[in-house]
Amino acid sequence: MKQFKQIWKWRHLILALPKIVWFNFHYLPFRQAIRLPILLYKPRFRHCKGSIRLQGNVHFGQIKFGFPNMSSYPDTGIIWDNMGGTMHITNGANISIGNASSVYIHNYGHVDFRGDFGATAAAKIICCHQIKFGKNVLIGWDNLITDCDFHALTHINNRGGNIAFAPISIGDNVWIGLQTITLKGTCLPSNVVVAARTILNKDYTPYGEYVLLGGSPARKLKDGICWNPESDYVDYIPINNNLL
């Protein structure tokens, strides 16, 4: 009975095994693909062009697309749509992009993970130019990260068009709260926390490190704030029924 429960728990991963094997050998050299470093949960492939490059130690399950599965969002796995761009993962980083998420990389897009990265659920990463993530980056639920507007605006007094894309750079040890929108040209320094439902759209490095950003658009809310991934736990306390 215990073995059956384990099989049932991982049934979607087992059913996706043919796609997992194909995806690894499609994108990686044999010596890396044989380790199955990329696991996929309920994958849906739109385009599987471009490349994925892994540098550093490579191990089984190092990269997880489509899980963990969060009960607050639909159990829809991951949408992968690479039109011909590159995903580059260095330093043996562990990557996790949760369920109900999607990754789109344009022909000229370049997504760079320089360290461990986690997106809980319903993350949408859209890269038409360049997106860089530092070490130990945590993305809350329902985040949108896009380096492109997909439409160019023109000023009535200027014949030239507006550049509709710009690189995004996220520093080390950054926590971005749920339902935040990160737009083109965003540059976050290391050791910052971004409040929920924030809109990021510019260079925030002049604020320095250890700050809390929030608002629409974002501004500095407080100094001396940081997120430490090594001590990120909450000690919940039961309700005292005598006080109810």
What are these regions (language model features)?
Residues 1-146, 167, 171-173, 180-182, ...:
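Domain-scale signature associated with acetyltransferase and cell-envelope carbohydrate enzymes
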Residues 145, 150-155:
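Short helix-loop boundary/capping segments
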Residues 150-151, 198-199, 205:
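Flexible glycine-rich beta->alpha loop in the catalytic core of nucleotide-sugar glycosyltransferases
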Residues 155-159, 225:
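Short acidic, glycine/proline-rich loop/turn micro-motifs
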Residues 177-178, 183, 196-197:
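Conserved beta-strand->loop/alpha-helix structural units within folded catalytic cores of enzymes
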